[in-house]
């Protein structure tokens, strides 16, 4: 690849890496401080903490995979297992926790009086816990399949860990990992999509009941609907881009197209980095904290640039 393009892509990757760690780190830090001070934390804040931690892990794992891909000859089988399992773990919880957040918005925002809806609404915490525990079945199945495939291939090579065999193993694992991601992502992605459609329906029903002169920014219910829809749309769109970028990256790697592979790696980091920024903008507490941090940084930079007399 042209050195200029390689340098530019490296700068963008580093910028996304820093941005993702800062935005997710802000979510974790602010909510942990509130947890310590108030001795309690709301359900949505608990979800945000674990979601942010999983995304920090996902950002690091994506970067490690990119670096190790450049140094494939130096990877051992055990290192390959750790990298793949860590990526699967962080990707799994990042997706399912975002889905849990979507379901939380669905049951908390709309004013619906169906019996089944009210029953689940008052048990939303138990519903989310059971959903996340149930998702562990898919996680374990995914890891077992990866382990069996890796052990079979390693046995087939007779313990050979040459460069060619490692490149073959890496390609096979990426292919299997992407296939499993496709299959195991169908349920959480569908749940998030259903939540999005039901929120649109709820907003439409709400606007139908409201008089025309009341349909504005002063309507708290409509504002909450729009905020939740903004978060869900960004999640669905960014996760789709994230998955497609991984798929195209794998194809580019097989065809030895380094430029396309690098572009896809850059694109894949947009999901865990920038969706958290959208979550911050949609959360009043986190938004105010981020503005305070930016003001403090601005004041400090201004003081440093002001010449002393």
UniProtKB/Swiss-Prot annotation:
GO molecular function terms listed in the Swiss-Prot or TrEMBL record: bitter taste receptor activity; G protein-coupled receptor activity
Entry superkingdom: Eukaryota
Keywords noted in UniProt: G-protein coupled receptor, Glycoprotein, Membrane, Receptor, Sensory transduction, Taste, Transducer, Transmembrane, Transmembrane helix
Repeat listed as a keyword: no
Leader sequence residues: none
Compartments, record wording: Membrane
Membrane topology: Multi-pass membrane protein
Ranges that cross the membrane: 8-28, 47-67, 87-107, 128-148, 184-204, 231-251, 262-282
Family from the record: Belongs to the G-protein coupled receptor T2R family.
Protein name stated in the entry: Taste receptor type 2 member 124
Native organism: Mus musculus (Mouse)
Gene name of the record: Tas2r124
